Amino acid sequence: MRNYNWQHQQLMSRQMQSTPLVICVLDKFASGGGLLRTYAGQDVSFALQVKYSFAGHLGEGGEDLRNWVESNGNFSCVLTGPTTLQADVVYQGAGTFVFFYKPVLAGKYLVSVRLGSGDVPGSPFESYVEPGATDTAACSASGLGLLCAEAGVEATFNIISRDHYKNQRTCGGDNYEVALTGPVCFNASITDCNNGRYIAKYNCIMCGDYYVNLRRDGVPITGSPFVLSVVAGKTHGPRNKFPKSS
């Protein structure tokens, strides 16, 4: 029995010096957004739990694990994509390391989680940051039809829905209204392109200066009202109503 205990202690000692297993817990620790998909401006957190290959449950030998991680260069997390972000790392005990970051630019990122100079299993991860909710103050309008037009000729301009961080929305559904006031008053028609872009169209038959009032859900976007000048169209001479002489 004494010999067995000695052998067991020797085995445990060798295992304590072996490489632990690193287990990624994706999204299950998320306080807001998830690691693989989230929204601009959302706080994201995810956890890694580390245990020795001989441990019966997560967190066994937590302080030893922490010391092992520190001796191997510690964990780090860097996101590369539309911009580069460095996540904060906090040790919460029992072999659990939590990563925190907040992306504000929408797009595709690669999330590289490293221990020292080497990636943990599964890293780098693909992460998609979607635009946040539409922010009326960040929406914009542009195009020649917002500045000038020719009487009797259809004119157009674009409306772009954006979130608080200026990311263009990737879907439609926003409620815009374009009202023109001047020598005559009328509304423009709006086409939803279902990608965050909207096309406003109108055909003004009377020359003059107009205010273009552009609202989303009743709230003016930045720059509204815009000043529009409608000029006379091309001159057309009278048609010849006299029969040709023989």
Where do the protein language model's features map onto the residues?
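Short tyrosine-centred short linear motifs in exposed loops/low-complexity segments
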Residues: 1-5, 41, 56, 93-97, ...
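Calcium-regulated, polybasic anionic-phospholipid
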Residues: 56-79, 168-178
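Hydrophobic beta-strand positions in extracellular immunoglobulin-like domains
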Residues: 50, 101-103, 159-161, 202-204
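Short S/T/G/P-enriched beta-strand
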Residues: 4, 9-63, 108, 116-164, ...
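Short amphipathic beta-strand segments in non-cytosolic proteins
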Residues: 73-88, 175-189
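Beta-strand-rich interaction surfaces with strong enrichment in secreted/lumenal proteins
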Residues: 35, 86-89, 100, 146, ...
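Short beta-strand/loop motifs in extracellular/secreted proteins, especially
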Residues: 4, 71-75, 107-109, 172-176, ...
